[in-house]
Each structure stands twice: as structure tokens, then as C-alpha cells.
Amino acid sequence: MKKQSVAFALCASLVCSPVYAKTFVGVLWPMFGPAAAPGLVELVAELKMMPDVEVRTYLHQSWPYLVQDIDHQTPGTRTVVVGYSLGANSSVFVANKAKYVDLIVALQPSMFSWNPSVTGNVGRMIEIYNPNRWMTFGGMGSNKLVGPNIEYIANNDSHPGAQFNPIFRNLVKTEVAKLSTEDEPP
């Protein structure tokens, strides 16, 4: 009888537990990794402090591992990809190979990388870029990605300075917080 009571209590606690969505955030570093992106390192630390948010980081050329991690998330998990510079370029490869990504935020993709159009299953994509290629060292942050569902935000940040822009940082944190509180995926 005691075992049945314990089993019943465990089942009841599981059934009565609140259900909340977990959000997985994959961050794609620029060339030279986190050493070249101290502002992004700070943002990653801030995201890790958010409730129900798991954050993993990847070198831009390791995007296939991010695709694997996204595709192995439990059903109902929200997925976000944040990429800066060549990491933003690599976000397109993630979009085209992953089963589904809720949100991609691409910060100043580089003109010095080949990029196909976004054809993957992405709920929403936001790109922040500087249309003046000379302010981004000849085009390091002025590439416009191509595909459906891309919202473009033009800025006038230098390429190294873009990662410190409060608009970018607040946008990422706000969008992750919104996804974390939604009840169920689309």
C-alpha cells in the first residue's frame, strides 16, 4: 500500500506540474571565435541567466553541429540561432538544413562569404546590417541575406562595434524571452 501511495504521489506531482516551454539558443561565433567578439560573449552570459533558456556556442564553421543539436531538441522546445559576421552567414546553412528554427538573428553578415538563399523552415529571421560597406571594413558587415521572412534592420555600426549595439542586444533578449513564454510551437 505504501508503494502505491508513493507511486500515486509521483504521478500526481508530474500531472500537476506546470508545463513551460524551454528555449534553445545556438550562437555562431565570427571568425576567430569568442576572442573576436567580447560583446557577444557578454550577451551569451546574459542569455544563460534567463530562466528556461539553454545556450550553446559554436564556431561559425561548426554549424552542422548546431543543426544536429537543434534537430535533437525535445518537441515543444523553441529554437533560436544568433550569428555574428561569418556566424551570421552560417545561420543560412543552419536554416536550410535544420528541421525548423523559430528565430534567426543575423548580425552583420559578411560579403566575404558565399551564401545561398534561405530556403529552410524558419519562423522568423531578422538581419541587422550596415548598408555602407566602407564602415564595415570593405563589406564585413554589409551583406544582405536573401530569403522569405527576413526583416532587415539597417544600422551604421562599424563591424567590430555592432556586437555592442544595445538595439541588437535588447532585440535578442526580448525575442528569446517572448519565445520562452509562448505556450506551444506554431
Q: What label would you give each PLM region?
A:
Residues A9-V15:
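Bacterial N-terminal signal peptides
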Residues S17-A21:
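Sec/Tat signal peptide C-region and signal peptidase I cleavage site
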Residues K22-G76, N156-P160:
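Active-site catalytic motif of lipid deacylating hydrolases and related acyltransferases
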Residues T23-G26, Y65-S142:
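Serine-dependent carboxylesterase/thioesterase catalytic core
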